[in-house]
């Protein structure tokens, strides 16, 4: 085996995963989700990037004397679309992002210098008192 062979393979794998993640992010950004409220009386179309690209309001809910209901329906439709975008992102990117996480760092060895509470360190149980305290 040549020196650095494992590192080269690891780097190539990381670059492939990064490319897959970028492609998945681009697909997500270009995807569309449809949110609705009031049983479909208000509908919105939102891209995976969060950009609102369409709003449809059934004329039945347009009442000049009750603007608050229409406002609530629009907010509800937007919330529905936002939740769908989040779910889609988790489904598409979750597995890829998890595969790209670096391994956890090794635990510090016992007796690591400068760790509070270590025997013999000032202020630790059974250790000499800290001057001035």
UniProtKB/Swiss-Prot annotation:
Q: What is a single molecular function from GO for this protein?
A: DNA binding
Where does the record place it? Cytoplasm, Nucleoid
Locate the compositionally biased regions of type Pro residues: 102-113
Name a single GO cellular component.
bacterial nucleoid
Q: Where is this region: Disordered?
A: 98-133
Instruction: Spell out the HAMAP family in the cross-references.
Output: DNA_YbaB_EbfC
Assembly and partners are described as: Homodimer.
Relate the protein's function as given in its record.
Answer: Binds to DNA and alters its conformation. May be involved in regulation of gene expression, nucleoid organization and DNA protection.
Q: Its family?
A: Belongs to the YbaB/EbfC family.
Name of the molecule in the record: Nucleoid-associated protein Rv3716c
What species is given as this protein's source?
Answer: Mycobacterium tuberculosis (strain ATCC 25618 / H37Rv)
